[in-house]
Amino acid sequence: MNFHIGSGGLGGIVWGGMDLTRMLASLSTILFMNNMRCLVNLIFSGLLDRFPTLNFVSVESGIGWIPFLLEACEYQLDENAVPLELRPREYFARQIYASFWLERADV
């Protein structure tokens, strides 16, 4: 199953008062955050425990943000004693894929 950078809705994402060019640049950059939300919800929902052979891919959202997100998930898992069968990094390794897009630093 895949999710794209446009998943998650667009309402209230950019500040008002911007001209169209600034708004499009801002929105196009922020859209990556929607995939972050999807991954966090996927990891903490318990869905990956219930369906251990179902795979997911984050499409056209790059990969540079993934290490930070997984580190934050690991931290919150420990802070909140979330009852998961695996660690967030283990779920990612087992069931989640991501695609490069425009970044070069992570290649």
Predicted regions and their residues:
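Catalytic pocket-lining loop regions of alpha/beta-barrel enzymes
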Residues: M1-V107
